């Protein structure tokens, strides 16, 4: 496996984010490589400190890692509010609008973001882009009527492919749905407009755009961490 050139940056971001966690918190665990480092950093604190927390995970992968490291997890059906969610992103533009869902967990990730009192996105410098869309836009779609949903997408100019897994079959999300990766268009200067158009298609479960009140911490290979906030109410 190719070594991640930003692994040290992700670890540094994760440790600083883990320092925000205090006893009594319910913590939302995102998905992806940066979130994995955050989960590990939380586990390190639990091993060294008398920290009383619970967590809820946005994906089976994050759940399994947290469970294996001894992080207490709650029933993911019954939480109403999360104190802090820490997650990553695939792309972030200058307005801190972002694309998430490269790992296929966008539906659950957005529920956690919606439920959280504080939303923190950790990103290395490679995730900062001038315009969203270069690496594609993941859309979670229903298996029922799959072909008709894709036809509706194509009819309004959104072209792509169903995501495949490592065995060559269709990638299935933790919710039993498909991921359709849109590659055309490949730039989204006004993602709010695209989000509204896409959500009008019945059968689209969730779209990878995140336009919300979030904090974003950008980590750089020179050791700097730049902390920004959308300022959206």
Swiss-Prot record:
Belongs to the ribose 5-phosphate isomerase family. Substrate binds at residues 31-34, 87-90, 100-103, 127. Keywords: Isomerase. It is an enzyme of class 5 (isomerase). Pfam families: Rib_5-P_isom_A. One of its GO terms (molecular function) is ribose-5-phosphate isomerase activity. The active site is at 109 (proton acceptor). PANTHER family: RIBOSE-5-PHOSPHATE ISOMERASE. Pathway: Carbohydrate degradation; pentose phosphate pathway; D-ribose 5-phosphate from D-ribulose 5-phosphate (non-oxidative stage): step 1/1. This is Ribose-5-phosphate isomerase A.
